[in-house]
């Protein structure tokens, strides 16, 4: 566990941090979040580390509790593509179908990697037949993304791709690099940054995860 640094030592206002702490505690007390944790760093120094609420089994949230990051993983996902670009393996102008031929159907023939990164791919919706119970099966993920139809012309309309974004990037990484996206992000990003409890995909930490109703 990291040692707390005095806010003044890193030019932070301790009173402002106290206000953040009070607001956090109020939101927990008011039931805005079933469980949450908040860590604030400045210049690599931990200045605030608080948690509160309960997991769905009634156990209190602690500094060891793990949370699903949801869309906070998008910057991590994009970073993986940037690594491949730096290594000369892809260009943002590449058609996705250059690296994943089966993707180029149902209106997605002209979708580029850059379109995916900027949410201009034109297929923000996940196929209705693809249910959350299918998500852990990567082969089904790949098939669903290949079959997904566009509802906008690629490159013309900004439309947030909440889920398809990560799935498409994950498969591009797998096809270009050869490693699964789970392995790539672990070996190339998480471990070098000492993020040993940050991972993609199901793992054996389920006893530490999930507040009662909503993911924070």
Residue ranges and their predicted role:
Residues 38-40, 44-45, 68-89, 95, ...:
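Alpha-helical scaffold elements that line and support the substrate/ligand-binding pocket
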Residues 102-110, 157-162:
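A glycine-rich, coil/turn loop motif that links secondary-structure elements
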